[in-house]
Swiss-Prot record:
<dbReference type="InterPro" id="IPR017451">
    <property type="entry name" value="F-box-assoc_interact_dom"/>
</dbReference>
<protein>
    <recommendedName>
        <fullName>Putative F-box protein At1g46984</fullName>
    </recommendedName>
</protein>
<feature type="domain" description="F-box">
    <location>
        <begin position="18"/>
        <end position="64"/>
    </location>
</feature>
<dbReference type="Pfam" id="PF00646">
    <property type="entry name" value="F-box"/>
</dbReference>
<dbReference type="InterPro" id="IPR013187">
    <property type="entry name" value="F-box-assoc_dom_typ3"/>
</dbReference>
<dbReference type="Pfam" id="PF08268">
    <property type="entry name" value="FBA_3"/>
</dbReference>
<dbReference type="InterPro" id="IPR036047">
    <property type="entry name" value="F-box-like_dom_sf"/>
</dbReference>
<dbReference type="InterPro" id="IPR001810">
    <property type="entry name" value="F-box_dom"/>
</dbReference>
Amino acid sequence: MNRRKNDFLVRPKRIRCYTQLSTLPIDLIIEILSRLPMNSIAICRLVSKQWASILQSSDFTESFLIKSPPRPRLLFTIRYGSKWHLFSAPQPRNFDENFPVVATDYHKGFSGNWCMQSFQLVNGFIYLNNRLSLKGKIDRVSVIWNPSTGQQIPLPDLGVKNSHSKSFFGYDPIEKQFKVLCITSSKEHQVLTLGTGRKLSWRKIEYSYPHYPRKKSNGICINGVLYYRNTNAMIVRFDVRSEEFRFVEIKMYVEILSLINYKGKLGVLFPNTDLAQLWVLDDTNKVEWSKHNFVFPDTTFEAIRATDTGEMFCASSCWRDSLYVSYYDLEKESVKKVKIKGIEDKLSIGKHHANEFFIFPNHVENVMVL
């Protein structure tokens, strides 16, 4: 607006700033961008090649994790109709936290014949298989996916003919490297390392004891070590960094329900008619276990898992109007239920059942680009 001063017409001055991002120190740029929320970072990657390069650097990734330490979340994968849907909800940091109802965030819906039995969640990245029909032949395509950035990395073919394979996804926190271990029925062991900047390729590794994992064993990565079930009464221990195998004997001749991360240690769940039993591997060298018994109020659960703070939880496998997650504190021997809101509204499930439903703990947002 123009103003008059002493009968003279005074026009407001417009000040323009011509400072370019390229003139600012890189450290300052990283400091500014690392304070942005995740959805804004995804948009900033599209601004310019320079911004994309900065946001893909290891310096930015480390700065972002320091400025915005990720709070673990529950990840829900639901197949409804012909489509998969991904939701997440806050995970309690303290068993005494009082929030009987939590809202979910909707991340993405995607089509395809995805095999969620192969689903493995490690440090914000997801490994899963898609079954494709190519020229009348069913083929599997393995993909590493970061739901936070949207990056999808199809893995190269193993190059092994007429062989079934089983893969496990792990992360080395020291070298900050993701690796995929693949074991074929021909007893070949191969490893693929991601994020090296070179073309992805499989390489064979040495092993001292021929073995093949159980079909339903997805395995779990804990502090740089992959654990998965063998066909015998033992668990295989694979060090992601050194790529060495060790074997942990289980003197319990019943079917294992699942392997879990219990407060940074390997937990083995055994089913029972009246209660569940948890074995915790307290000493990996001496193979010493501590044992815990517990009972869940809901017997029709999808699976029993554990949060990063040690609460056991499960979600009902049959739900319509509302989804509840039950948490169990082993030390206090107490149970609480949390209502999960938003899934039924987004999918308009109503009285219909979801076709398939899986829940995974300890998901964190990761800005890393492999």
